[in-house]
């Protein structure tokens, strides 16, 4: 017996919507996920349609060339004078200190204008003498060469310098011959010195750097390691306060005077009332002049000798750029460098070029300027 099959009428649209709403209420998270996915699909379809309708143009970008800047040139300075030198090797050249006579019979001297640093002090009987130091400059003639004293050895020691001289006081010779110095005494190296015929002894011993450099090389003295003065570029002061300088050292033949020349920013040196000249190169014109007050006494060695206290501290005046600057000199020990210290305890930088330092006795010397 057949059962009658009843046909169900199709669901109406409002019933489907009702069921969908019920399902969404029961599954809210799935609803959001489906909606989000739908939005993304629609967005991708829109982008694809736009891209097909408006294809992007390809832009050719030329390659970027990167040009490396060349490194800034390295500037090398002489540790002795602060002036520019050719290369690093030049900054390490051996320093040579030469004792040069300053009695009237020795004037005008040779090679003194090219010295980097000069120390001037009384050697005996009020007669002054120079310790002239050279590094990058190589004069073809230097002299007259004379004997050394203990305080010149003290000043030369920090420069790791060869010391050129003809004998010396007992204390000085004992010091320079103790094995701690580069002693190139004429007594033991006569081939590096000669006597000139146009002057009489003892004011006629000369040398040059062709011979001294060969002598230094033969002994292995090819480099000098030392700390020089702090240096700076020179700049004339707009209102100079020291254009005329007088230094009283001993007698009239040895007292010195300097006139400031603003055009060259240097000092024209005079001694004994006359221009102080280099026989081959003319007027001596240091860039920096320093008056250094020192204690000086007489001591018995191989006879009575002058003795100057070189270690410790004392007053000094630096003349550069037309200005006088009162400072303190300081040297902690024989092998420590000489420094000039301002009121704030800082080292005063000196102008590049020749520096002339005069040791003035506290007991009877002096310096004045205007």
Can you annotate each of these PLM segments?
Residues 24-28, 41, 50:
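Long, intrinsically disordered low-complexity regions enriched in Ser/Pro/Thr
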């Amino acid at each position: 017996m057949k059962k009658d099959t009843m046909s169900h009428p199709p669901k109406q649209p409002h019933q489907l919507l009702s069921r969908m709403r019920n399902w969404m209420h029961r599954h809210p998270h799935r609803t959001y996920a489906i909606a989000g996915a739908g939005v993304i699909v629609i967005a991708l379809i829109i982008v694809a349609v736009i891209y097909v309708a408006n294809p992007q143009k390809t832009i050719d970008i030329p390659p970027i060339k990167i040009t490396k800047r060349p490194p800034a040139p390295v500037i090398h300075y002489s540790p002795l004078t602060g002036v520019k030198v050719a290369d690093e090797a030049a900054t390490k050249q051996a320093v040579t200190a030469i004792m040069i006579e300053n009695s009237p019979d020795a004037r005008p001297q040779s090679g003194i204008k090219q010295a980097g640093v000069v120390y001037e002090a009384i050697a005996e009987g009020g007669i002054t003498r120079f310790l002239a130091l050279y590094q990058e400059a190589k004069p073809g003639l230097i002299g007259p060469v004379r004997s050394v004293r203990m305080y010149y050895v003290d000043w030369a020691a920090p420069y790791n310098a060869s010391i050129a001289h003809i004998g010396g006081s007992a204390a000085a010779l004992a010091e320079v011959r103790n094995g701690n110095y580069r002693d190139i005494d004429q007594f033991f190296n006569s081939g590096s010195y000669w006597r000139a015929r146009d002057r009489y002894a003892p004011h006629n011993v000369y040398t040059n750097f062709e011979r001294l450099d060969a002598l230094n090389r033969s002994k292995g003295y090819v480099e000098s390691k030392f700390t020089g003065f702090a240096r700076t570029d020179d700049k004339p002061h707009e209102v100079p306060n020291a254009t005329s300088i007088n230094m009283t050292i001993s007698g009239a033949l040895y007292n010195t005077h300097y006139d400031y020349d603003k055009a060259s920013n240097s000092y024209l040196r005079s001694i004994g009332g006359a221009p102080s000249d280099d026989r081959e190169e003319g007027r001596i014109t240091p860039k920096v002049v320093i008056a250094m007050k020192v204690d000086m006494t007489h001591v018995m060695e191989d006879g009575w000798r002058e003795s100057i206290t070189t270690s410790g501290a004392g007053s000094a005046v630096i003349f550069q750029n037309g200005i006088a600057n009162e400072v303190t000199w300081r040297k902690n020990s024989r092998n420590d460098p000489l420094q000039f210290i301002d009121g704030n305890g800082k080292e005063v930088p000196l102008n590049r070029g020749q520096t002339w330092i005069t040791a003035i006795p506290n007991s009877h010397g002096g310096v004045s300027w205007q």
